[in-house]
C-alpha cells in the first residue's frame, strides 16, 4: 500500500480523497497488537498533519519515539520495537521528515522550500523549533508556534 500523499509524491487531490487515502493506510496500523515500523510511522505522521488531524499526528509521533523504538545504551533507533538491529538510519530520517514535512507543512518545490499546508502542533505543544536547517545553501531556523488564539503559525528566519 502506498500513500498517494507522501511528500515525495504529494499528488494533487481534493481533501476527501486525501482523507480516504490516509484512513485506508492508517486503519490497519491502529489495530491492537499491530507492530509498527519506525519508517512506517513517518508517512502516517505526515499524512495526519497534512489533514490537520492533531490527535493522530501526536499518536504517530509518540509511537515513533516510544514503544521501545530507541534502544539503550545510546538510544539508537531500531526498525521495530521488537528487534535490536542497531541503528536504523532510514527510520531516523523518517522521524526528521515527520517534523519537517508534517508539523511545518513545508515542501520542496522548484521555487524553494514552500509552505504547502498549514502547520500543526500536537495537543499540549506550545512550539517546535528546527535550528540551522540548510536548504540550497541557505540556513534557516524554522519555528512553529501558537499565536494568541492558539493557532500554530510558521516562522522562517534566515541565519
Task: Annotate each PLM feature.
Residues 1-98, 102:
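Active-site core of glycosidic bond-cleaving carbohydrate-active enzymes
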Residues 55-159:
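Non-catalytic C-terminal accessory modules of carbohydrate-active enzymes
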Amino acid at each position: 500500500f502506498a500513500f498517494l500523499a507522501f511528500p515525495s509524491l504529494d499528488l494533487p487531490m481534493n481533501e476527501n480523497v486525501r482523507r480516504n487515502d490516509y484512513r485506508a493506510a492508517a486503519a490497519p496500523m491502529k489495530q491492537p497488537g499491530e507492530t509498527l515500523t519506525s519508517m512506517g510511522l513517518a508517512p502516517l505522521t505526515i499524512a495526519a498533519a497534512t489533514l490537520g488531524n492533531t490527535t493522530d499526528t501526536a499518536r504517530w509521533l509518540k509511537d515513533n519515539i516510544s514503544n521501545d523504538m530507541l534502544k539503550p545504551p545510546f538510544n539508537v533507533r531500531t526498525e521495530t520495537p521488537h528487534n535490536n538491529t542497531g541503528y536504523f538510519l532510514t527510520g531516523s530520517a523518517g522521524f526528521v521528515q515527520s517534523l519537517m514535512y508534517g508539523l511545518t507543512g513545508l515542501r520542496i518545490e522548484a521555487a524553494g522550500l514552500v509552505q504547502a499546508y498549514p502547520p500543526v502542533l500536537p495537543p499540549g505543544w506550545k512550539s517546535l523549533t528546527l535550528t540551522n536547517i540548510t536548504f540550497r545553501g541557505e540556513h534557516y531556523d524554522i519555528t512553529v508556534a501558537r499565536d494568541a488564539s492558539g493557532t500554530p503559525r510558521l516562522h522562517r528566519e534566515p541565519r
